[in-house]
């Protein structure tokens, strides 16, 4: 199993592991654990919700649930679809995915928004309010519905795919209530039909990856996410001021019992930053919105974690453990988004290369695939590919069949 760190978190968490899995699929030639962990954690309760951690005392006692963790788990199943196209495994896992998305469907209001969810709605260790209907939960559920529909259709089940897309369309209509037209952003929560002013990077990113924000809004949402002048480090663990990097603010879930403290920051102007774990969603949203050239500089935020411990990434920007697997998103991003190499699930043995060099002049890496390792180098105006096996490579309008041991150049590709 994937565990988050060698100290207190030696548990098989259901949601955290999505980052660990993506690191494995991106950098490791042995995908056995990346394949196994989603199966290990596919142990739904009688109501369809997954335990927040499995194979231990948390699952045994069923002390609580983290609803959003099940949605990250769905994404890990979709990762298996994209990287392995393993029909047998996906056929076994898809009924569990269906039960997860159905669990949220059963807890929606008249507008199709999940509302007042039970358990611990964690999001991450940032101060993201989750009362009533929550933008981040809605966006993650939207992503899960789209992923379930895609995998169902791929397996030949058009009926379930249509069902999921109908739910998604209803959700997208209801999600409009979370749009603040005066500030041109999504707020975190809708309580008793009223938008509360708090907002976050999480809300904007989830709206994009969940397919809930109209495309014409995406550039504005990227601005909200990336505007350093308005971003704030805020955590419920510290109710009276910022939880900046280096403050060693203690983590704490006391708010689960006493409720969220009222915001101390300027909720009309400031946007709560995502912690390292949720940044994988933020970065996916930025790339999906066509702003991937920003990513190389955004990854420099991890310098704060290296200042705290030069050998590993810590749990949050402000404290917690000094070694936490869920904070390792840059390792994935440098391959998937900056180098831009990802598999084509619909054409086994093929790679899609969509680089985002940003401020870098070049990037080069050995990338594991289901058939073997491929070396890719990206420079301004040129992509070079070399493999020990035959592979089809596509980049924009350029494509090539790379033969074993032969270096192939894709010169016409425009690199941004």
Where are these regions (language model features)?
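C-terminal beta-strand-rich structural cap/linker in extracellular carbohydrate-active enzymes
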Residues: 381, 390-395, 400-416
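Active-site core of glycosidic bond-cleaving carbohydrate-active enzymes
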Residues: 12-364, 371-373, 382, 391-397
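C-terminal accessory/binding modules appended to enzymatic or scaffolding proteins
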Residues: 376-378
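Short, surface-exposed recognition loops or helix-turn segments adjacent to catalytic cores
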Residues: 4-5, 55
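Short edge beta-strand/loop segments characteristic of extracellular beta-sandwich folds
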Residues: 384-386
